[in-house]
Amino acid sequence: MRLHVVDHPLVAHKLTTLRDQRTDSPTFRRLADELVTLLAYEATRDVRTEQVDIVTPVAPTTGVRLSHPRPLVVPILRAGLGMLDGMVRLLPTAEVGFLGMVRDEETLQASTYATRMPDDLSGRQVYVLDPMLATGGTLVAAIQELIKRGADDVTAVVLLAAPEGVEIMERDLAGTPVTVVTASVDERLNEHGYIVPGLGDAGDRMYGAAE
């Protein structure tokens, strides 16, 4: 597994406002969208391309375009849905799948309640979206599902990560073609499994609490 922390002043600026408890939901959603686009720029550095011959208004030339099969973008519901627009803004031709996963707040274990994506992901580059890499359980389970379907190149785009979650990813996904792209690796997890200093519950801050 490879970890890439994006070091950029605009990333740090937007992340600081996201962390601020005074930031309201509409502003949080907008900033998360903008931050994901910045992270997506880094996450797609190795997106697969192929040569194409074109003619400009001046002369013929050779360029590149995204190759087939098209990349697949998979947000983890529900909070990952708030990252989708920011990702497909840079990959408008990507296909989109969905994984519905929920974490038990007592055991911190993840379970899947919904899946909508191709059964065969052989040869596909997949970008999985989840705001927080906290305990690592949800993201590990999601990526294992993608690899089971044949994905050979998975990039996880997360707003924040905790060292404990990174360690779990490195342990459970050792030797797999996985990259994690994030704006920050924070200090630690607290006793409730929240990232410290973090930004709170990303889903609740995007959409309001779900009872």
Swiss-Prot record:
One of its GO terms (biological process) is uracil salvage. The keyword Nucleotide-binding applies. Binds 1 Mg(2+) ion per subunit. The magnesium is bound as Mg-PRPP. Allosterically activated by GTP. The keyword Cytoplasm does not apply. 5-phospho-alpha-D-ribose 1-diphosphate binds at residues 78, 103, 130-138, 201. Uracil binds at residues 195, 200-202. It catalyses: UMP + diphosphate = 5-phospho-alpha-D-ribose 1-diphosphate + uracil. Its cofactor is Mg(2+). Belongs to the UPRTase family. This is Uracil phosphoribosyltransferase. It comes from Streptomyces avermitilis (strain ATCC 31267 / DSM 46492 / JCM 5070 / NBRC 14893 / NCIMB 12804 / NRRL 8165 / MA-4680). The lineage of its organism: Bacteria, Bacillati, Actinomycetota, Actinomycetes, Kitasatosporales.
